Amino acid sequence: MEMVEEHIKGILKNRKIHFTLIDPDEQTPQEALEIAEEAILGGTDGIMIGGSTVNNDEVDETCKILSENIEVPIILFPGNINSVSKYADAIFFMSYLNSTNPYWIYGAQALAAPIVRQAGIEVLPMGYMVVQPGGTVGWVGDAKLVPRNKPKIPAAYAMSAELLGMRFFYIEAGSGADKPIPPEMVGYTKKATEDMVIIVGGGIRDGEAAYTAAKAGGDIIVTGTVVEETNDVRGKIEEITAAIRKASIE
């Protein structure tokens, strides 16, 4: 497989992207594979693996079975230093920018760096910011949650992250959020940066929300909870990816 970052930027030359987030803590590796296969049939461009409370065995077993059976990129979305697997294609090596705890801003990264190097997987440097309500990741990460009516705050953080050399910026409302990120916030964030890939997640459960996030400036739209809640993963992902593609050409 080509380098994941090159793959992502190659797709972005033509259209926006959809990733499916799978939490190994919520299903067995075999169930995760079944979800991934259905999501791929629905048009997803990649599988993210991660969660706020997973352990290494769950991540490793899930990544291994996926690597043996699917062709799209498998990207780690780590909740802590125990979320690294050599079976993944890449890792979002991220700093939790609005955490009040130095551990999440740079401590965990220092501890994880030797593990990531040893695993030999591609690194995608990313700034990460959580907006209200925040969910589990906001609580676990000791976040100073961004108010939903303050779109210029994540824009400023994204700009600073880009100046520090990060190439991805993930803005999210937390897993299972009742509302997605406000489109004004996505728009300000995109306009504040030059070449960053803007990722938007949390609270996106249907095509309309995905369309709005992509149209506002999101380069990659992430959905996770929706594949755990639906009985028709392929159909739901088809709805979402079709909306993202529509936003790409309008």
UniProtKB/Swiss-Prot annotation:
One of its GO terms (biological process) is glycerophospholipid biosynthetic process. Prenyltransferase that catalyzes the transfer of the geranylgeranyl moiety of geranylgeranyl diphosphate (GGPP) to the C3 hydroxyl of sn-glycerol-1-phosphate (G1P). This reaction is the first ether-bond-formation step in the biosynthesis of archaeal membrane lipids. Mg(2+) binds at D23, S52. This is Geranylgeranylglyceryl phosphate synthase. CDD domains: PcrB_like (cd02812). HAMAP family: GGGP_HepGP_synthase. Its EC number is 2.5.1.41. Sn-glycerol 1-phosphate binds at Y170, I171, E172, A173, G174, S175, G176, G202, G203, G224, T225. One of its GO terms (molecular function) is magnesium ion binding. It holds the Pfam family PcrB. NCBIfam families: GGGP (TIGR01769), GGGP-family (TIGR01768), PRK04169.1-2 (NF003198). The lineage of its organism: Archaea, Methanobacteriati, Methanobacteriota, Methanomada group, Methanobacteria. One of its GO terms (cellular component) is cytoplasm. It is found in: Cytoplasm. It is an enzyme of class 2 (transferase). Its cofactor is Mg(2+). Pathway: Membrane lipid metabolism; glycerophospholipid metabolism. Keywords: Cytoplasm, Lipid biosynthesis, Lipid metabolism, Magnesium, Metal-binding, Phospholipid biosynthesis, Phospholipid metabolism, Transferase. Belongs to the GGGP/HepGP synthase family. Group II subfamily. It catalyses: sn-glycerol 1-phosphate + (2E,6E,10E)-geranylgeranyl diphosphate = sn-3-O-(geranylgeranyl)glycerol 1-phosphate + diphosphate. SUPFAM superfamilies: FMN-linked oxidoreductases. Its main location: cytoplasm.
